[in-house]
Regions:
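Beta-propeller domains with acidic blade repeats across secreted/periplasmic ectodomains
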Residues: 1-33, 37-40
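C-terminal substrate/ligand-recognition segments
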Residues: 4-5, 35, 46-66, 85-88, ...
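Boundary/linker elements of alpha-helical solenoid repeat scaffolds
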Residues: 21-28, 51-58, 85-91, 122-125, ...
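Amphipathic alpha-helical scaffolding segments comprising HEAT/armadillo-like alpha-solenoid repeats
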Residues: 35-44, 65-78, 99-113, 134-149, ...
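Alpha-solenoid helical repeat scaffolds
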Residues: 41, 56, 71, 86-89, ...
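Alpha-helix N-cap/helix-start positions at coil->helix boundaries
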Residues: 51-52, 81-85, 117-119, 153-154, ...
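Structural signature of alpha-helical solenoid repeat scaffolds
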Residues: 62, 92-95, 129, 164, ...
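Long internal repeat-built scaffold domains in very large eukaryotic proteins
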Residues: 211-213, 221-261
Length: 261
């Protein structure tokens, strides 16, 4: 009996058919498509423990396009009920509906800056990066630049990943400023990786003469990753006044590694 009820509920839930007024055996049946209660069920499915329910609900909401923007924004505003999975899937579904929507773009930018939820801030940065790569998407907003100075290391790292994935080569000054002051190793690692992806080798070689030790070390690591420095250049860098840069430039077997001692 439980199995029969669950099966009937599944078909009713996903719009196969429903008896009019719930009367079994009735000839007239109503197909359920974009009714309000179905939207609520789809939103609930975004927070389901079953990945297939989340994926199917997201695809259906994206298919319905701009009509779902309001309900999804309401779902994100409902802080009391939001779990991480629902928050993540609702945000990404909203971002995928219209990558070129300036209103949504501004909303995600404000979330990066102001939201209480760390997860929602991180997801918003990822969505903005995805939109920047989309053929019809919008470029990264200045909110991403501000995120590079955030007190939370995970936000700084995600902002760097957004710059890297979007392929922005006009943000070098911001990345270099971060390299100059960054103390978190994971963020520093991400920063020189972003530098490597967005700046050509010759430009990074010029950064080896930068007055800021963190910039020199970041540029050096990115060039070592590509084996792009001649032995004589490494010998000069081995005399650097900053210990980590000098140590990284000294030949060793096995190699020193990607960051330093």
């Amino acid at each position: 009996w439980c199995l029969l009820r669950a099966t009937a509920g599944f078909f009713e839930r996903y719009g196969v058919y429903r008896d009019v007024d719930g009367v079994a055996g009735r000839q007239g049946r109503v197909w359920l498509r974009d009714g309000d209660w179905i939207v609520r069920e789809l939103l609930a499915d975004l927070g389901s423990h079953l990945p297939v329910w989340r994926a199917n609900a997201s695809e259906e909401l994206v298919r319905r396009k701009e009509g779902m923007i309001g309900p999804l924004m309401d779902a994100l505003r409902d802080d009391a009920k939001n779990e991480t999975s629902l928050e993540t899937w609702a945000a990404w579904t909203l971002g995928r509906i219209q990558p070129h929507n300036a209103r949504l773009h501004a909303m995600f930018g404000s979330v990066v800056r102001d939201a209480k939820s760390l997860n929602l801030r991180l997801q918003s940065l990822r969505i903005l990066a995805w939109c920047a790569r989309h053929p019809r998407g919008l470029p990264l907003p200045d909110t991403v630049r501000a995120a590079l100075t955030d007190t939370e290391p995970r936000i700084r790292r995600e902002a760097l990943l957004a710059i890297r994935e979007a392929g922005h080569n006009s943000w070098h000054a911001d990345v270099l400023n971060l390299l100059a002051r960054e103390t978190d190793r994971m963020v520093f690692y991400t920063a020189w990786g972003a530098l490597r992806e967005t700046a050509p080798a010759e430009a990074r070689k010029a950064m080896l003469d930068d007055q800021r030790a963190g910039v020199r070390r970041g540029a050096l690591l990115s060039l070592l990753e590509e084996d792009a420095l001649a032995p004589e250049a490494l010998r000069l860098l081995a005399k650097d006044t900053e210990h980590s840069t000098a140590w990284l430039s000294t030949p060793s077997d096995p190699p020193h590694g990607l960051y330093g001692r």
